[in-house]
Structures are given as C-alpha cells and as structure tokens.
Amino acid sequence: RACKYYPPHGTTGADFGYPFEEFIKNGVFEAMSDCGVVLCTHGEEHGLEAEDYFDRNKNAEEIFYQERLPRAIEAMPDLKIVAEHLTTKTGVDLVKQAGANMGATITPQHLLYTVGHLLKGCQYHLYCLPLLKFEEDRAALREAATASDNTQFFAGTDSAPHTQKATDCGCAAGCFTGGIAPQLYAQAFEESGIDLSQPDGQERLKRFLSHNGPNWYGIALSQESFTLIKTPQEVVKLDVPGEGQVTPLPLGLGQSHIEWSIKL
C-alpha cells in the first residue's frame, strides 16, 4: 500500500496539490506511518523563482531533499518512503543516509543523459520532470543503481505516452520508454562500466530491474521472466487509437535502433 505526494502544480493533474508541510501538520503522514502505508514522493519544491527552480548550485529537487523531506523523516522515523524518479546526487545521498526505510526509483533517461543532451539541439523528447541534471548527478545515480550491495535503488520508468509532445504552447513533460525500458537500463549499465557478459554484472542488473523493488515493498517476486540479448532492436512509433502516435524516446532522439533487444 502506498500514497503518492505531488507538489502543487508540480505535474499534470496536480494543480490542487497541498504543500508538503501540511501533511506533516495534519497527521496524514503520521497515520500512514502507523498503518504501514508507503509515502512515494515527486521530490521537488515548487512555486520557486526561475533562478531557484534550476540553477547550477541548487534546484527544485535539491531544495526538497535538503529542506522538506528531512522534516518528515525526523518527525516520523518509521515512515517508509520511496523517492520516485530521483535525479540528483543530493537525493541519492539522502536515501543512503536514511537507511532501509527509504528507497528510490531511477528512470532510464536519468541514467543515460544529462541536461546537456536536452539543451544541445533542444531535444524536447528528453523533457521530463524532474529535469535531467548534471554529470555529477548522473554519476551518483549510476553508482547507486549499479553498486554490488545496492538494495535501496530500483527501476521506475515514469514513462509518459504523450501523443502530442510539443505544441506552440509548450512541451508535455515525460519520456516514453514503454516496451524498451529494460533494454535502455542495460545500455545504461554498460555505459556505467558494468560488464553484462559476466555473471556479476548480470546479477546487478537483475537486482535493480526485478528484485530490489519487490523486496523493498515486501511483495513476492514475479514468476514471469524475459531475456535481454545484445542484438540491435528497431524502435517504431506506437499507434494510440483515436489519439495519434506515441514516439519512444530513442526515436525522438533520432535513433531508429537500440543496442539491446528483449525475448519473452
């Protein structure tokens, strides 16, 4: 059982969200802790000025994990928390410091890319929230995901199938990785220096993709399986009846094939 916190105006459908502190004051988080309900967070501070929302020295996610979430951890140390779609070294450090009661998900795009990839050529298919960050952040995410003793970090795609990604009025936030996420995670692990031809590397990827999440939530592992094969796979647009087509992330970046394929 889990509940998701979205910051006010922080994402689609969150226009009427409450400030994080309100849930500390009104007893909601305390009741969740007492009942064993997990708090999942979209960890960003909103309502910020542009220079504070995304800056080299601080950003919306760092402010949330430095100033907001620690208050909940201090007030309710038994509350189980998942930092969803983590993007910063600051967030990684907090998860590690918090210990076993805190976990985190990481998306394929945040392991593969940085804000430089987004800005160079204005690659709007890489626009998601939280935004891609800097190389030191990607390095921290990669280290956390691929570590041999990792039990707190696990896969979470946050995939968003927008049929109309960019318009004259702005850009829909979210990267579509449905059906190709395991392949992209495998690519990210290899780029992080993990040899997936060896049993140790395979075990690290398997834990991140399939074991750490269920183990952290205390649910049974899936009995279904798939096999990743180092063979290029073509990426195609998906038809959504009555709405149009969805462009998978690699195709939006001009990549018609990805390095790994999947066998069910």
Can you name each region flagged by the protein language model?
Residues 1:
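Short acidic/polar active-site loop segments enriched in Thr and Asp
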Residues 4, 12-155:
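Histidine/acidic residue-rich metal-binding segments in metalloenzymes
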Residues 9:
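Glycine/aspartate-rich loop-and-adjacent alpha/beta segment that forms the canonical ThDP
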Residues 13, 49, 134, 160, ...:
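Residue-level detector of solvent-exposed, low-hydrophobicity positions
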Residues 106-174, 230-236, 241-264:
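Active-site neighborhoods of metal-dependent hydrolases
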Residues 151-221:
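His/Asp/Glu-enriched, well-ordered alpha-helical/loop segment
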Residues 190-264:
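Active-site microenvironment of metallo-dependent hydrolases
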